Amino acid sequence: IVVLKDAASAAIYGAQSGAGGVVLVTTKKAKEGAPSLSYDATFGIRQAMNLIEPLNAEEQVKMRQLSYANAGLSLPAGWDTSKNPWVGTTRTDWMDEIFRTGFYQRHNVALNVGTENYSNRLSFAFDQDEGVLENTFDKHFTLRYNGKFKLNKWVTISEDLIWKNHEDRSVDTNSGYTGAVIAAMFMPASATVYNPLDGTYGGTTTEDPAYIAQYGSNFADAHGDAVNPMRLLEAHNRYDKTSEVWSTTSLEIANIVPGLKFTSRFTYSLEHQNYKNFSPIRDEVGKPELSNSLNNYSYRTDAWKTENTLTYDNTFNDKHTVGALFSTTADHYAMRGLEVDGKDFADESSYLQYLSYAGSTTAYDFLTGPDANVSLIGRLAYSYDDRYFLTASWRRDYAGRLPKDNNYGDFPALTAAWKISNEAFFPENDVVNLLKVRASWGRVGNLGSIGYNYKSAVLKKSSWSEQAQYGPESGKVWENFVYNGVALNPNLTWETSEQWDLGIDLDMFNNRLNVALDYFDKRTFNLIQEQTMNWPNTIGISGMLVNQGEIRNRGFEAQMSWKDKINKDWSYFVSGNFSYIKNKVSDIGVKNQDGTPGVWTGEGGFRNIPYIYQTAQGQPLNSFYLIKTDGIFQSDAEAAAYVKDGKRIQPDAVAGDLKFV
């Protein structure tokens, strides 16, 4: 695994690398040698650690009593154990109920057969994980073939073929009313997993008629609308299966002339997913759901990529090494899906949980893409006597999702290095084996903020009613209509990152100690984001994507590793790294009406605090904008004495309230 972080290294990979760098992964290949069969297996267990320890029933009652007393309110009857003794007895540790020890296993089998002219490798892997939450699992099957065939001394054909099948039953953990873990936090400890009267799932309190008759109520309102988490885990019938196929076919023609090689590669991938989730009626006390539903969707993704590359590498007079590359690439992506929701099933038996038994159904089809890109790539490299190194590259990308007049971008890069340790004046020694300084500059394009459907997202279909609020049609209601979903920007262009990097590489003590030091300065400009300023809500559609703003990231990275042998059979390797980065918005790109720099706002708010994160010029990206506090008031007297400019700024504050500054 190789990670390319600097823009000069990543530039040749284009917009697919985005602004974050490139990760290169080399997998196991077929090789020459006698036929071999290998097998390895791994077994283990998983447990969730550092779980929240919930209060027991007695502690919950005490907490409620204290909170109502501190607020000067009377205790509700549901939390008064003299009126509702049920609430004071612990019956369930909900965290213990929903979590378990999960068993996992891994199996890998590989067969390798190879000669001088051909090699084949076939492998099969099976992974299975029991989830740490009840009734969850994850299962993978992977079949892979890798073959290489040398037809003659010039022509080689290779094939990589992978089939993967993934099945899982995962669950939501933190959403209201459907998240099992958050439901376990809210469910009272006095409740039971199952109703002792009939074995159905228990609610927040008892449903025993004798108890209700004796105490006049089961006080269900005391616990709000909590949901039994075990019902969420066990009763919902989930099914999620994904099958994927990747194929890469390569043709290589070597030594067309000495040092010149041509490589053509075609990759195709196909992915299909089928998801099904049946949600039964939830009738226990707490948060009932009196209708059932079935969500079923499937999609198919097709993608292909072709690459044709000429490379030239040669050394002249044992000192001059020259390398050149020219490549063209093209890729295409499309995804088509169908989602059908059914509800009002008369019978919830598992063999009847199909859409044909639903009382009503609603269907949605969707298309992502098609998206296409074409690129031209060139690179020249020169080194002299393994001391001086210079590399220059250029890439032109054409992106189908950008407007026609701005759909291409040019991204150059330069790298220079000096291996000082190979100079004649550098003394031979056993301490410093390599000393190399390097510098690089490069630009990389990024389209990650633009969806595949950007240019085709003008029209959307509504499946709900909408009433006009403005204009001559005000008050009119439309059903199932087509409308403009987003405004397109004909001037949208590439988001671009430009980066400088200065580095030192140092190997010491017979190459056992390796040190790499880097300083970088990265400027990202023409950021692609939704326009949030000067976009009236009365337009009725989402803000258009625009290029605005500039972000600077400066920092330092240090990596250090040590490797050594204990004897001929044993060795060890230790590594560590340190990094420091400073991020700020150097240009916000928009101005207020008074000419001052504007602000980018995030989406929505939290508990009546609007736009809890914002981006302002001179500040880090997406900074939190919250109300500052200085602890809590320790007494009513302290709250009454808390003033600013002679006035109380929190006139209703009492002991225990937050102190705002």
Indicate where each model-derived feature is located.
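Short, glycine-/polar-rich solvent-exposed loops and beta-turns at beta-strand/coil boundaries
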Residues: 14-19, 136-139, 173, 428-433
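Conserved small-residue
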Residues: 38-86, 339, 453, 563-661
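Non-catalytic regulatory/gating segments with a bias toward low-complexity or hydrophobic composition
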Residues: 1-2, 22-25
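A generic structural signal for short coil/turn motifs at secondary-structure boundaries
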Residues: 10-13, 130-134, 399-404, 425-426
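Short beta-strands and strand-coil junctions in structured, solvent-facing domains, enriched
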Residues: 8-12, 30-33, 45-48, 131-132, ...
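Residues embedded in well-ordered regular secondary structure
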Residues: 16-21, 29-134, 172-175, 192-221, ...
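N-terminal plug
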Residues: 8-17, 47-51, 473, 491
